Amino acid sequence: MEIVGCRAEDSSCPFRPPAMLFHGISGGHIQGIMEEMERRSKSEARLAKGAQLNGRDAGMPPLSPEKPALCAGCGGKIADRYYLLAVDKQWHLRCLKCCECKLALESELTCFAKDGSIYCKEDYYRRFSVQRCARCHLGISASEMVMRARDSVYHLSCFTCSTCNKTLTTGDHFGMKDSLVYCRAHFETLLQGEYPPQLSYTELAAKSGGLALPYFNGTGTVQKGRPRKRKSPALGVDIVNYNSGCNENEADHLDRDQQPYPPSQKTKRMRTSFKHHQLRTMKSYFAINHNPDAKDLKQLAQKTGLTKRVLQVWFQNARAKFRRNLLRQENGGVDKADGTSLPAPPSADSGALSPPGTATTLTDLTNPSITVVTAVTSNMDSHESASPSQTTLTNLF
């Protein structure tokens, strides 16, 4: 789009002032004024011829009184001295506008044409861009490198942690929650509900020495021997500590650090207690399956009101205690101090999946033909799941 040419004019000045215009002015002054006007008209004629020659060199024929051009916008004749050339068409200065927002494009650097219509840059990207960045919401051209996560596409510079703005590259672990991207450290703290907003990524790295948090893939781990208290190797704080007791008369507790950041401040531990119906549900399922999968954990979370993470660690500790009891029985020892025992796993030749004494079974609501092997009592209350919604931890390849 450019301003091209002007109308061709005769070298002589077409303006001739009437004699009455100079009434009352002496003859010498009138002659000087006329000479000055003729000199200016000749200089303007030379400039017009130069612009006309430039128009021919650029491939645009100059406008002439004999064959005036038609405006592609309004369809009228172009009688102005200057006009616009865009998409091989001629336009009045006032007629080149965006067909969507009616923005005048005479002073814009670029304009876009699609199916005979003229668009400004914003409207063209909004309507015809193939994909838009999920972070900055700007269009992504076909030649750009992008990062993909789920169904979203990002510019390379926009694929950063929503909390600390750390750039994520290929091979980095990241998490997504509600279409927001988080680095591994902030996603773990987000899941635990213990993130202090005043700390940035650089401050966390300086205090922790690398942010080498363990990766939890959502499945219970199998340990040999007595389970130990797990700690983060980089942060030096407890992740989760669970009591392994399963007594119905006494509520079990989950010990967890309420605020792992900053390490210099001491805070009281938050204790989460199990209720009797929660213990009964978990123990009855443990009698059937020692290692529940994600689908079973979801069903248990809905029935007990506990999070998947809490259920995972409870089953992990229950498996460890069950193995200790087996070792004691093999060695001929009897655990007299512990008055409770976990139910034994079902034998391979047993035909029933549910233990005796249970009234109903927990079924999968999404597929009625599949029965989840979780046995509950008839007076069990249903609870909503307290686990975070739409959260995943993804490894970017």
UniProtKB/Swiss-Prot annotation:
GO terms for biological process: cell population proliferation; dorsal spinal cord interneuron anterior axon guidance; female gonad development; gonad morphogenesis; male gonad development; negative regulation of DNA-templated transcription; neuron differentiation; regulation of transcription by RNA polymerase II. Its main location: nucleus. Gene3D superfamilies: Cysteine Rich Protein (2.10.110.10), Homeodomain-like (1.10.10.60). It is found in: Nucleus. Pfam families: Homeodomain, LIM. The keyword Amino-acid biosynthesis does not apply. Residues 267-326 bind DNA. The keyword Ribonucleoprotein does not apply. InterPro entries: HD, Homeobox_CS, Homeodomain-like_sf, LIM_Homeobox_TF, Znf_LIM. Residues 248-272, 330-364 are annotated as: Disordered. One of its GO terms (cellular component) is nucleus. Interacts with LDB1 and LDB2. Involved in gonadal development. This is LIM/homeobox protein Lhx9.
